[in-house]
């Protein structure tokens, strides 16, 4: 239970700060930090402080201290298996999926076909929305630096692993954002019988 006080402070401060924001739908206990006693207690505290919203924690997986099942990077086959499993009743939201690095997003439509087919599946959060570059000047030119741009050659870095957004650091759209917009559009058109005026 070391750090329990810190867990409590973070949960209480988060809920007190954000409880009146209408866009806050779900409380999160954190990300990628294991599960155990502190997270069990933090979940109970969150439920005590706000009974109106669900609380989720990715590393709780199928344990009791999460109201949603929120995995990372499940394949479409894993997503459908969850949807078809009658023992799995919690709403499903991928807290990270469809890693948007480079010219990626392959398989995005397959995920959304499943999300729209099964009520238990609620969608997910694309990693990332925006490239994580920092504006700086190099050789007299303004650039968005990342990875190996800091320090001499050989300085430890994540290389281009931080450049994985739907939009660039300056918010210029990357090509795959258009696929996302199309697949997630509110209106779907089916059929092509124009003589009967059916679309």
PLM region descriptions:
Residues 1-199:
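Extended substrate-binding grooves/exosites of carbohydrate-active enzymes
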């Amino acid at each position: 239970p070391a750090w329990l006080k810190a867990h409590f402070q973070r949960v209480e401060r988060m809920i007190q700060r954000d409880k009146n924001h209408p866009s806050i739908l779900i409380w999160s206990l954190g990300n990628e930090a294991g599960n155990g006693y502190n997270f069990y207690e933090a979940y109970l505290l969150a439920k005590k402080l706000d009974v109106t919203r669900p609380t989720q924690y990715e590393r709780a997986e199928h344990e009791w201290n999460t109201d949603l099942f929120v995995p990372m990077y499940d394949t479409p086959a894993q997503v459908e298996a969850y949807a078809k499993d009658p023992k799995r009743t919690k709403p499903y939201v991928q807290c990270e999926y469809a890693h948007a690095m480079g010219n990626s997003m392959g398989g995005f439509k397959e995920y959304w076909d499943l999300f729209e087919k099964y009520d238990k599946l609620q969608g997910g959060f694309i990693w990332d929305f925006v490239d994580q570059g920092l504006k700086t000047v190099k050789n007299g030119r303004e650039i968005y630096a990342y990875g190996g741009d800091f320090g001499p050659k050989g300085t430890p870095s994540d290389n281009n692993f931080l450049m994985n957004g739907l939009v660039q650091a300056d918010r210029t759209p990357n090509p795959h954002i258009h696929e996302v917009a199309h697949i997630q559009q509110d209106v779907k058109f089916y059929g092509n019988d124009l003589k009967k005026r059916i679309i």
